[in-house]
Amino acid sequence: MKKALIFGITGQDGSYLAELLLENGYEVTGVTRRVSVNTTERIHHILPKITIAEGDITDGFSVNKLIAEYEPDEVYNLAAQSHVGTSFKQPSLTWDITAGGVLNILEAIRYSPRKDDIRFYQASSSEMFGKNFDEGFSSKGISIDMKYQDENTEFIPQSPYAIAKLAAHHLVRNYREGYGIHGSCGILFNHESERRGENFVTRKITKWIGEFVKWRGGNEVDFLQDDVYHTGIVASNFPKLRLGNLDAKRDWGHAEDYVNAMWLMVGQKEAGDYVIATGETYSVRDFLDIAFARVGIDDWSNLVVIDPKFYRPAEVDHLLGIPIKAEKELGWKRKVSFKDLVHRMVDSDLE
């Protein structure tokens, strides 16, 4: 039985990855920090099937101890301070977890007597590209006539989070080439799910819709039968949905599809770096259209307020990943469409 050690198991990706590994017969250990609040909500249903180990990714001694004690065949690092906006407010914390933590894992693997038997996955981010992109190409019957990012696009990070992720990305490549560590990086574009944190714009939208429907005392069917909501009229005593840049475009996929790519990477004979994306880009406005339509609201303009405080410094306004390498070498392909992703998130928050 293979053993997997997951840093960041209580997050969106960690919970889906743990489920996938359990389905494939792994012995799964998840690393959590000792905190005063319960953080295991996303993995509560699988707690009897996994081992939870206390540890701190920012503490090298703690990481060394975990690698030595649990003897993993595969190590997945999904731990990070992953909110871009928060990284501007807490850059030091973001660096310590997102970059420093990766160095601690790599050093622990490097000095482990089982170094050659351990495979490491690092969650890199499309935010590393910043505002940079390539434009237009045609290869083997595939034509892209728009701005895009792939494994060859230059990284120009625009936030403390992206800078820390890029440092970690380069560290993995350096340890792979310099010390022979089997370390792969998934350059993950935006991926959401019903388990997405409420501080992310997609979940903020679907959670608000769920609360609004419940406040009205109706449900999806009621909205479809109530024409007053099609005009965008809303009671003044219900707080409106406050958002930032509605025209920012992202390549959005479902987290379940993306954790499958992680697993496929560590199973490759040779380690490498892969863009994991859908190859489609949509704006926040597009997300709103589909989300509100799910509950029968055609005109949401009077329900949403643009609030400048949600604009970020050095805003990245366009991300579109081309996952050709992952599709060819890993045999990976996304299964959940953008529309289905939005519907699943809305439906979950309506429950």
Predicted regions and their residues:
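N-terminal Rossmann-like NAD(P)+-binding domain of SDR-like oxidoreductases, especially those catalyzing
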Residues: 1-191, 256, 262, 266, ...
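C-terminal substrate-binding subdomain of Rossmann-fold SDR/epimerase-dehydratase oxidoreductases
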Residues: 17-23, 30-31, 55-58, 196, ...
